[in-house]
Amino acid sequence: LSLMDHGGIYRTLLSVHMKRPWEDVVAFAKAAPRRIIPTVRIKGRGYHRGPRNKYFDRLEGQLGSDPFGAMAEVHVWHDSDGGKYHEIRIDFDDELFLAAFDAAKGKDWPLIVHMEFAALSFIGKRDYMDKLETFLRSNQDHPVVMIHMAQLEEPDVRRLLAAHYNLHFMTSHASPFYQSGGKPFINMINDGKFKPQWKKLILEYPDRFVFALDNVFSKFWMPDLYLDKMKMWWNVASDLPNDVAQAFAHGNAERLWKLTAKPDGVMKAPHEAMKALGPVTGYSANAAHR
């Protein structure tokens, strides 16, 4: 919470990773119910490795816990990046995907879909794009959010937004911070602002973009990196008209996930918060965890 305060973040949709039990995120949310939204974990044992019943058991257990208010990303295509990660390649009619989608529909939660289009061949991209659009047309009454901008550049995103009014995009990993790794994430930002084509598109579709970070690994929660990202994103958002910036930063997420609106004036920009609050406190501030 101290890290969020310093970064100007009022609320976080939080899930668990690796061997951490999902009950932990429920406990975090109970301790700070206005700030932490516990988010159902999809990936993990049974989804991309091991017996499938492990996934179904985990999903059922989480869905039976009242505090959950969102569902984390559902992987359809996840590249291994040369063997560094588990590759996931399933279709929209796979029982794993459909179980998550049915659960999201039952809870009236947006479905976050993980697709890495830039890591596919030309034919692979074409085939998965056809499958995605078929799914979107078949479920026009349910909001779908593509995490990491689906690794798509502006022309593809523009076409998809025009064709599918239930489609939204999350800006996680779509920044200069992710251009030196092995995965081909797009970069929406140049010189501390949205690139012109992206700013134009956001202004045309102000209700379809959701600010997000995807803090998968512990290093992403370390104060220096986290706050550098948040300083950048606050500056980027400040180049938008205020109503569009507010929608991008939190309003669209509040609408899609049916969250209470962020109270006015409760958060400061990172450069102001860091002066007012002093050092970050809590677990992530301990250098031993870096």
Give the ranges of each region predicted by the language model.
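Well-ordered, non-membrane alpha-helical segments in soluble/globular domains
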Residues: 1, 22, 52-56, 93-97, ...
